[in-house]
Amino acid sequence: MKNPMIKNGFLLALFALICTGLVAAVNQQTVDKIKQQEQQELMRVLHQLIPDEMHDNELTAQCTLLLDKDALGTDSPMPAYIATSAGKPVAIAIEAIAPDGYNGNIKLIVGISTKGEVLGVRTLAHQETPGLGDKIDLRKSNWVSQFVGKVLGSADDKQWLVKKDGGDFDQFTGATITPRAYVKAVKNAVWYFNNNQAQIFSLPLNCEANHD
């Protein structure tokens, strides 16, 4: 009686081990697929923000990490992708957080030329109200296109406000908090870059190490 019980116990343990291994393998494949999709989406967004004709490098390979809570809206290091032409920096795409969105953090990315001109802005993640605050998503509205070509004259440039506050940027009907937070976050990122270009371009390319 003992031998069959031991045998059955062994078989059950072996079966459980195999099942665990299969689940782990499937989970890893899923994680890898998600990472691959995220990387493809990032590359698509970067090439929208910084046109191919501006640079001759692979943007995702030239990535550094920036840390400034006041400017980037978070305590965490944020990736910045440097565009170069013939080895010389020509533009950058900086990820930032608008911490005061209506429903919490809004993650965005800002393309800026070395002359301080905004090349484009995209929303990477948000939880804003559908039909109201979600107009920050280019798939819902072209609202973010307002930033293209903008420059920041000073830290208190009054143009960098929503129209309700006396600035240049449209707000949403029934939703002012979201665009106000978004404009502020983009402005802060541009101001930070304009005043720290030399330091940023001298930082090590360390995004991959941070993600491991």
Swiss-Prot record:
An example of a GO molecular function for this protein is: FMN binding
Report if keyword RNA-binding is assigned: no
Tell me what topology the record assigns in the membrane: Single-pass membrane protein
Residue runs in coiled coils: none
* Localization in the cell: Cell inner membrane
Q: Could you tell me which InterPro entries the record lists for this protein?
A: FMN-bd (IPR007329), Ion_transpt_RnfG/RsxG (IPR010209)
- Give the EC number(s) listed in the UniProt record: 7.-.-.-
Give the protein's cofactors: FMN
Mind listing the UniProt keywords for this protein, alphabetically?
Cell inner membrane, Cell membrane, Electron transport, Flavoprotein, FMN, Membrane, Phosphoprotein, Translocase, Transmembrane, Transmembrane helix, Transport
For this UniProt entry, what's an example GO CC term? plasma membrane
Major subcellular site: membrane
An example Gene Ontology biological process? electron transport chain
Q: FMN phosphoryl threonine modification sites? A: 176
Q: Where are the transmembrane segments?
A: 9-29
The entry's family comment says: Belongs to the RnfG family.
Q: How does it assemble?
A: The complex is composed of six subunits: RnfA, RnfB, RnfC, RnfD, RnfE and RnfG.
Known function:
Part of a membrane-bound complex that couples electron transfer with translocation of ions across the membrane.
What name has this protein been given in UniProt?
Answer: Ion-translocating oxidoreductase complex subunit G
The gene that this protein is the product of is rnfG
